[in-house]
Amino acid sequence: EWEKNSLKPWISKHPERESEFKTRTAGIKVGRLYTPLDLAGSYTDKLGFPGAFPYTRGIYATMYRGRLWTIRQYAGYGTPRETNQLFSKLLSWGQTGLSLAFDLPSQCGYDSDHTLAEGEVGRVGVAINTLRDMEEVFAGIPLEKISTSMTINATAPIMLAMYIAIGEKQGTNISRLNGTVQNDILKEVVARNAWMLELEPSMKLAVDIIEYCTRHMPNFNHISITDYHFREAGADSVRAAAFMFADAIEYIRWTLKRGLSVDDFASQVSFFLGSYMDI
């Protein structure tokens, strides 16, 4: 009835700009209007309810009405002191978590005075060479009360160990530490190239983190598997998602071989997605 009485008369006088509308990146066709009829007979299968399979409407029953998502800006200035000052300001402005950016030498395992680090020190994040550097980054910040995300992969075991040491120095039981370490070395090898060891020892270190956090830091996301970097490297949304899930399967296989049950560690596996305009 709407098409007959409203749409058709209007289009006869005011044609649409395009004969067909598609999403900007993946070219998915977008309909003119969507109604409950589009889900007729499959509402619970495709949409469902919050906190219930297939989780289209969220993994928690109340979602943001119960608790807002953590608000944190990916940030890291050249020196630890500058980064600490930035973090303190962000927290005073109402930010509810921290997201630490490392410079490329720190990501690839080079000290700041290494010849290969020349020109890159402190450029895309903070330079971390020692535990003292990391202590300066988090000076005056109680780790027990804040969630920290660290976008670090090849040197993730080192940076996470430093973070744990700071928590212990603050008198925090490490089981109460909360945050995320990216620890996704496969996407580094395939799409980004910030890796330092061959694949097998790199995977061993990644699973070392998964196992350690599972056993000692149950609130910490021990891996954040990402499709974003595949998109930036040229993959479309379908292939990027495929790479991401292929990586996830491989991490799970390696962790199962370590002797852990999937129910032990899977709840702290997180994902990082680049949705572009197709969301």
Report each predicted region and the residues it spans.
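Active-site cavity-forming subdomains of large catalytic enzyme subunits
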Residues: 95, 117-256
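Short glycine/proline-enriched loop/turn "hinge" motifs that connect secondary-structure elements
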Residues: 60-64, 214-217, 262-264
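Gly/Pro-rich turn-and-neighbor structural signature
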Residues: 2-31, 36-42, 158-160, 169, ...
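Flexible loop/turn segments at secondary-structure boundaries
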Residues: 40, 77-82, 98-99, 104-111, ...
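Acidic/polar, glycine-rich intrinsically disordered N-terminal extensions of enzymes
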Residues: 1-132, 137-144, 169-172
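Generic beta-strand/beta-sheet core signal
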Residues: 33, 72-74, 100-103, 149-153, ...
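Glycine-rich, often proline-containing surface loops adjacent to acidic residues and nearby aromatics
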Residues: 65-71, 144-145, 229, 267-273
